[in-house]
Amino acid sequence: LIKELVNMVIQHAEEEEVKELKNPCECPRALHRVCGSDGNTYSNPCMLNCAKHEGNPDLVQVHKGPCDEHDHDFEDPCKCDNKFEPVCGDDQITYLNLCHLECATFTTSPGVEVAYEGECHAETTNAMEVLFQGNPCECPRALHRVCGSDGNTYSNPCMLTCAKHEGNPDLVQVHEGPCDEHDHDFEDTCQCDDTFQPVCGDDEITYRNLCHLECATFTTSPGVEVKHEGECHPETKVNQLILKSCMCPKIYKPVCGTDGRTYPNICVLKCHISSNPGLGLAHLGECKVAVLAKETGEVRNPCNCFRNFNPVCGTDGKTYGNLCMLGCAAETKVPGLKLLHNGRCLPKEQL
């Protein structure tokens, strides 16, 4: 009799297993609670597996038993920002930062570990092609609003990256938090027409029109100014393809070059150094007002500012778009103006 009961139990278990293989949501009513990585308690492992198949493919079991308040720490393993602090995984893929690598252990690359800090070596993989593995629009539902350079607010950095891949390749994050009325000033930095009214930049490159030159100050040629109207003279024109071999992220993490120009990030500076061996790093952060170039003794225009919105408050009680813009005002409009603090001025500070 005992043997028959054991056989019946085994047969029932096998039937349940077959059912689960046929339809993952045909689950027994047995109460055997487990905690999911989304912070929810499921009646049994089969119910968790059902939820996984019904729209939450990254769901995994955290532990047996119901979830408690601490288990919510496991929600959204892919809630990562887009700060460029690359790490190379032992799968020879460059990840945007450590968080993105840890996210991959839950999604595309289970068990991946850090091989070393920095981008993977060029001979192993093209770093910029693999910063976002899989579908860039498979985003967590986490609410961590960011403001895009198109003036739109995105639910989180992943949603902004999705929009970038879906038809807006020049889109970048301006700042964390929702956009406000001032952020629309930064829309469409490089939306230029093709009218041929050439100008020659002081980088000896001919630009199709003034708008294209101004666009270059945000992308390939930070700090470039108009040398004269019309095309550059052929004998002085330099190779315009120098920078095409440099694949740099469109992240604004400014550094100051020894030529007195502010570069959007260290990668762009290194790219310019490759064609200008005398150029070097002066310091991290934007160049100070009227930096004296070491090689030429030339004083750069203090109003060659990027339009990234990183507000600062001046001692005049006014909010400036970024530190460079405050420096420009100090040199041209408000002598003696200094930085009061980072961030917008408070109402009580406004004069």
Swiss-Prot record:
PROSITE patterns: KAZAL_1 (PS00282), KAZAL_2 (PS51465). The record marks R141, A142 as: Reactive bond. It comes from the Eukaryota. Disulfide bonds join C25-C50, C27-C46, C35-C67, C78-C103, C80-C99, C88-C120, C137-C162, C139-C158, C147-C179, C190-C215, C192-C211, C200-C232, C246-C271, C248-C267, C256-C287, C303-C328, C305-C324, C313-C345. It is found in: Secreted. Keywords: Disulfide bond, Protease inhibitor, Repeat, Secreted, Serine protease inhibitor. Residues 1-131 form a propeptide. GO terms for molecular function: serine-type endopeptidase inhibitor activity. The keyword Secreted applies. The keyword Ribosomal protein does not apply. One of its GO terms (cellular component) is extracellular region. Residues 19-69, 72-122, 131-181, 184-234, 240-289, 297-347 form the Kazal-like domain. One of its GO terms (biological process) is negative regulation of coagulation. Thrombin inhibitor. Prevents blood clotting to allow insect to feed on blood. Also functions as an inhibitor of trypsin and plasmin. This is Serine protease inhibitor dipetalogastin. The lineage of its organism: Eukaryota, Metazoa, Ecdysozoa, Arthropoda, Hexapoda.
